[in-house]
Design a protein with these regions (language model features):
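Intrinsically disordered, low-complexity terminal regions enriched in charged/polar residues
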Residues: 94-147
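A structural signal for short, well-ordered beta-strand segments and their strand-loop junctions
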Residues: 27, 47, 84-87
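Beta-rich catalytic cores
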Residues: 33
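Ribonuclease/tRNase effector modules and their secretory precursors
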Residues: 2, 89, 144-147
Length: 147
């Protein structure tokens, strides 16, 4: 999938709007942050990473390193911290607890293109990556996002 910075920011804003009734969230200003939204729910600091997908699947795949990076943040603080992954498909947002993904997901090592197939359709550069494969029914909450 080709990275479109404007579309990504629009998706983050849509998620921010949909989550406003659950807490006070802001968009991360750091482009390289491991999370996209941060704020508080019931006075507990909350971080949310957003991933957009083009289709709905029974099982989702995410790089294990992304989940590990989010979990490290939780272990670095003594304060309570909630960390979620939100997968967006069209106008639906699915919220998952990162700890649930780690505990209930299946870790696999797969070979994948180093670059996206859209940007480099003939790429034969393959690397091995660890991914976590988890069921969509692990989601805690399904949100409707506005256009």
């Amino acid at each position: 999938m080709h990275y479109d910075k404007n579309k990504t920011k629009q998706t983050e804003k849509r998620c921010l709007d949909a989550l406003s009734k659950y807490g006070d969230f802001k968009m991360s200003e750091d482009e390289y942050s491991p999370f996209d939204l941060y704020g508080y729910t019931n006075n507990v600091k909350t971080l949310i990473e957003i991933k957009e997908r083009s289709e709905m699947w029974d099982r989702w795949y995410i790089e294990k390193q992304k989940i590990d990076n989010l979990r490290k943040l939780k272990h670095k603080t003594k304060d309570p911290l909630r960390i979620y992954l939100m997968i967006v498909v069209g106008n639906d947002g699915f919220l998952f607890k990162v700890d649930d993904i780690f505990q209930m997901g299946k870790i696999e090592r797969i070979r994948m293109n180093k670059q996206t197939s859209k940007d480099f359709p003939q790429s034969d550069i393959k690397i091995r990556k660890e991914i976590i494969n988890f069921h969509h029914q692990l989601n805690l909450l399904k949100l409707k996002l506005n256009d």
